[in-house]
Amino acid sequence: MYSPSSPQSSEPMSPESDYGGGNSINNSNSSNNSSANQSPQFSVGKMKVDSEEKVKKRQVRLLKNRQSAALSRSRKKEYIANLESKAQELTHSTQELHVQYNKISSTTFETKSRLEFLEKSLRSLRMENEFLRTKFEDINNNNIKSHSRSNSSSSSLSSSPTTPNTTTTTTTSTTPVQLIINNHKSESSPLLLNSTNSSPTIASTLINTKDIINVSQNKNNNNNNNNNNNNNNNNNNNNNNNNNTTNLLDQQQQSPTPVLESLIKKDREREILIGINKINHFKFNNNNINNINNINNNNNNINNIVNDEEDEEKCKINSVEESNSNHLNNNFSNLSFSSPNVNSQPIYLTRVRSSSYHPSNYLGMESPTINAGHHMIIPTESLILSSNHHHHHHNNINNNSNNHYHHESSTASSSSGGNKLPSLYSITNNLGGGNSSSPSSSSTSSPSTSSPSTPKSMGFPSPIFIGSSGSGPSSSGSQINHRSSIIGLSKLKSYNNNNNSNNNNSPILYPISTNQYPSLINNNNNNNNY
């Protein structure tokens, strides 16, 4: 069996066990387990210790591995850093390219729109040029026709000669030939060339048969007559030419030529087109300005409408909140202390109402029907009141309560006359309201038996004794047990008997702590002893 005192267990562990001695440890553990499970004759062999050289080699190998791992890590980190820097550069370059692309796209869009506009303008100019060419050709044709007509009329006038001296046997007439040259390209006005100015080209002779027979006889006479006729025709032609030139000059002075008229018309048409273009451009700019102004006005109107709607919604919300608050106040104002099972009443009043006292009517106070119209009302605002407000008003309550118990035998009109606050007795009576009096209280107390000088006949104690161990007046001489920290001592509003206000006649109760006002409780106890 293996024992703890055996030399195998007492041998020290070699330092190589941290690096390479794990096999020996495992062998020892396995041998221990097998010895425990198998027969007791099993023996564990000695642990083989590695040599120092092997240990050094292992250490060197480990160092090299660590160094190579550190190098690989550093290289990986550098590679990752380089990749990140390249990625950042690429992102910057892509952003710049996006910006450039946007700029180029905007410029290309502008150029395309400009080209389209120029193409449209070119088309319109071509159409205008074609239209003007057609007009120009029509005007030239009309001018040529008019000149030809004038020339024909002048030639007809010049072709009618005057021959006063003519023979009966032979009649000869010569007419000059007119040459009309129309230079369409260089000149628009025709040129008149009379051949008779230089030399006669054509001599039209009308010869009768009689003249042919008598040629030899009348040869000299014919020659003389021909010469005379030629001279007369030349004179007539010269006169006609002079008259025509003077008439043309007068016409040119009086009215311009049709060519000038056509040029003036073209200039006027161009001016008209320029003016129309200017007017259209001005209208376009005005339309753009008006559209922008209309858009701004519409936006302003929309904003004003939205603001008005928001204001109306706010007013509606405020009015709804006010109406809800008024509705709640009206609902709370309809609640009285004569109905103890209402959930909206304070807890201390419901406890007092259910456990402490039962109200009853008393002499000298108002009737139950009148009290029913003047129930004590707690608005929601009266339950939230600071202690400073109570400090400010508790002296007035004490003074008024003392004055009332000194003058308790007076009637309701004298006790409520003026602006005096009612006493604690009237408070407790108003708390009852004469509506929820129990039959026991109505049977025990009556108006004939009760008197203001005996507080025991009241049928319920004042609210000061809420939470006390005694039954109210019987324990007035002893100290009060301060079990409850809140009592129903009231702070009342001043009101008039003239009924100037409808809702201000009802007194308001405020919660008061007994721990804050011990002196006030003592004063009230003294008042109850009267």
From Swiss-Prot:
It is found in: Nucleus. GO terms for cellular component: nucleus. Residues 1-17, 24-39, 149-176, 220-247, 436-478 have a biased composition (Low complexity). Residues 83-104 are annotated as: Leucine-zipper. GO terms for molecular function: DNA-binding transcription factor activity, RNA polymerase II-specific; RNA polymerase II cis-regulatory region sequence-specific DNA binding. Residues 1-76, 142-177, 216-258, 389-481 are annotated as: Disordered. Residues 248-257 have a biased composition (Polar residues). SMART domains: BRLZ. This is Probable basic-leucine zipper transcription factor L.
